[in-house]
Amino acid sequence: MKNPVETAMNLVPMVVEQTNRGERAYDIFSRLLKERIIFITGPVEDGMATLVCAQLLFLEAENPKKEIALYINSPGGVVTSGMAIYDTMQFIQPPVSTLCIGQAASMGSLLLCAGHKDMRFATPNARVMVHQPSGGFQGQASDIERHAQDIIKLKRRLNEIYVKHTGQDYDTIERTLDRDHFMTADEAQAFGLVDRVISEREAIEAPRTS
């Protein structure tokens, strides 16, 4: 069965613009990239993470001070892929705003809260879910033990990131992430995952271009 996200991407509309050299066609996402808008849509995995990181670095090279906007609608995915995006967001110079449309679950929620302070948003009907990392291992007992130790270290590191960006204490984060924890947009704001719930564009301050 085909991945519905891949199927949808094959149906991306084209935008035609008039230039001094005649007409030029862009796919809609390339056109939005010109406006410094990046989409994180669907499962977070290495291929998607590579594209998102490349777009972030490209936009930094174009203008190291102008805001970049990340639109997130993701169920989460591979932790290391998400951490690649997270680290790139923190590494580059431009402030990165985040906006949850639809859902931001698992690694999606971590990327949502990792936006620049006061520039993290969710739409009214967005859903957010946080939880601890999960994984399955097989092999020799000593290898399984090492994998278990590693995922415990990873859990601790993810908790520390949520502490940093939400303002919650470590015990609260650990308790909240112990199981799948679902939040409405307003609950996500109260928890510190987003700064504001917005229903119209005017509610977002003008992009920072200084």
Swiss-Prot record:
Disulfides per UniProt: none
Lipoprotein recorded as keyword: no
Localisation: Cytoplasm
UniProt record, GO biological process: protein quality control for misfolded or incompletely synthesized proteins
Record-annotated active site: 106 (nucleophile), 131
One Pfam family from the record: CLP_protease
Any one Gene Ontology cellular component term annotated for this protein: cytoplasm
Gene Ontology molecular function: ATP-dependent peptidase activity; ATPase binding; serine-type endopeptidase activity
Enzyme class: hydrolase
UniProt keyword terms in alphabetical order: Cytoplasm, Hydrolase, Protease, Serine protease
Catalytic reaction annotation: Hydrolysis of proteins to small peptides in the presence of ATP and magnesium. alpha-casein is the usual test substrate. In the absence of ATP, only oligopeptides shorter than five residues are hydrolyzed (such as succinyl-Leu-Tyr-|-NHMec, and Leu-Tyr-Leu-|-Tyr-Trp, in which cleavage of the -Tyr-|-Leu- and -Tyr-|-Trp bonds also occurs)
Domain of life: Bacteria
EC number of the protein: 3.4.21.92
Subunit structure: Fourteen ClpP subunits assemble into 2 heptameric rings which stack back to back to give a disk-like structure with a central cavity, resembling the structure of eukaryotic proteasomes.
Role description: Cleaves peptides in various proteins in a process that requires ATP hydrolysis. Has a chymotrypsin-like activity. Plays a major role in the degradation of misfolded proteins.
Protein family according to the UniProt entry: Belongs to the peptidase S14 family.
Protein name from the UniProt record: ATP-dependent Clp protease proteolytic subunit 1
Organism: Chelativorans sp. (strain BNC1)
Gene field: clpP1
